[in-house]
């Protein structure tokens, strides 16, 4: 895409790493990619600046505490250490009162499902998202499993919040002949992760009340390429995700198409829930478009060389003004299973 740099935010605010405070930057100010080094490291001069990171901040780096500060401190050596709380402006007085809490870290997480109480159209899909609230430095992957989906419906599962990320999105689908009185009371959503060497399982809220609505104006289909054309699977056969395999460092062709049911307008689409390092290649700021009165268009996935082997459910979603891949409340396609696999024909050296 045209954007040269993408920023990951925390609830719409800039996230600061290394317990630093968010600051404003002037136009054309240099930006550096940094690598943390422990105290006492011998740094080879290379012409680039060296930054000393002190244990100090004004606002918590994850932006969860408003104007309050938070530091994560690991003593580099045995000794006595002092904590100092001051006004950042250097002001002081008898009414400048602060509260200081010192405690051990308790890494944990919670997950919230958004896009609840959806209205689904027969044969179509609606997006939902799962947002992770990470605590006290836990940055590992989180797996979400959805079970108990009634017959005639499908939900993306399992889903994975990747290490260091806070969002994954899925697609909830209704068959063309889905029943309006389906029993959703048995649906369970669980999140599992390894925290501190122990497996932790948390329950997650479910979809709530799912309503079967009227026929959609169009249905979006995401499919692999088959001999230069889309697979063209029948809508009634969308029971299990089709598979698409990509090799790190390469591109692979896929197709977006629409079954129009009275709507011939331009359709703007994005691809959501791709693995970190996999993008839709060679597109502009408008994303992927199916033009007015047209029904299909090809596009290409590209995977960076460093992407690890994995399986991930992804889907197309009608474009929104959001800055992230949150599918909540958006019309989506039935998901496909994107498989990232190393090229086994390459001889190791």
Q: What are the language-model segments listed below?
A:
Residues 120-122, 159-168, 287-295:
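Short proline/glycine- and polar residue-rich coil/turn motifs
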Residues 74-78, 88-90, 162-164, 173-181, ...:
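Short, surface-exposed loop/turn segments at beta-strand-coil junctions that are enriched for proline
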Residues 147-157, 273-286:
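Short, solvent-exposed loop/linker segments at beta-strand-coil boundaries, enriched for Pro/Gly
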Residues 135-150, 263-276:
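Short acidic, flexible loop segments centered on an aromatic residue
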Residues 1-137, 143-145, 177-179, 188-204, ...:
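C-terminal edge strands of extracellular/lumenal beta-sandwich accessory domains
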Residues 127-133, 253-259, 302:
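Short edge beta-strand/loop segments characteristic of extracellular beta-sandwich folds
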Residues 114-120, 240-246, 286-288:
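Short beta-strand segments of immunoglobulin-like
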Residues 69-71, 126-128, 166-170, 252, ...:
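Short strand-edge motifs at loop-to-beta-strand transitions and within beta-strands
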């Amino acid at each position: 895409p045209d954007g040269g740099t993408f920023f990951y935010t925390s609830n719409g605010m800039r996230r600061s790493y290394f317990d630093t405070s968010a600051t404003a930057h002037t136009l054309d100010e240099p930006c550096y990619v940094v690598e943390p080094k422990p105290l006492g490291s011998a740094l080879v001069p290379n012409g680039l600046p060296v930054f000393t990171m002190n244990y100090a901040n004004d606002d918590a780096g994850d932006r969860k505490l408003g104007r309050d500060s938070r530091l994560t401190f690991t003593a580099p050596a045995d000794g006595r250490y002092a904590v100092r709380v001051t006004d950042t402006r250097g002001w002081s007085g008898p009414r400048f009162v602060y509260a200081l809490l010192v405690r051990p870290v308790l890494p944990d997480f919670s997950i919230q499902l958004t896009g609840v109480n959806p209205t689904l159209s027969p044969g179509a899909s609606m997006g939902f998202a799962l947002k992770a609230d990470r605590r006290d430095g836990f940055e590992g992957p989180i797996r979400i499993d959805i079970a108990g989906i009634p017959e005639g419906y499908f939900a993306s599962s399992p889903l994975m919040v990747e290490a260091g990320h806070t969002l994954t999105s899925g697609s909830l689908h209704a068959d063309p002949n889905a029943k309006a009185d389906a029993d959703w009371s048995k649906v369970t959503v669980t999140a599992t992760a390894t925290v501190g060497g122990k497996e932790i399982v948390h329950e997650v809220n479910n979809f709530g009340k799912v309503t079967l609505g009227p026929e959609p104006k169009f249905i979006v289909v995401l499919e692999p390429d088959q001999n230069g054309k889309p697979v063209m699977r029948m809508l009634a056969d969308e029971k299990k995700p089709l598979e698409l395999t990509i090799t790190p460092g390469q591109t692979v062709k896929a197709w977006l198409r629409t079954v129009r049911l009275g709507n011939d307008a331009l359709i703007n689409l994005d691809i959501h829930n791709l693995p970190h390092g996999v993008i839709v290649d060679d597109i502009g700021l408008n994303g992927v478009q199916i033009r007015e009165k047209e029904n299909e268009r090809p596009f290409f996935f590209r995977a960076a060389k460093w992407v690890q082997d994995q399986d991930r459910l992804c889907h197309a979603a009608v474009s929104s003004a959001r800055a992230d891949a949150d599918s909540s409340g958006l019309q989506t396609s039935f998901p496909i299973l994107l498989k990232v696999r190393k090229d086994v024909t390459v001889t190791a050296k």
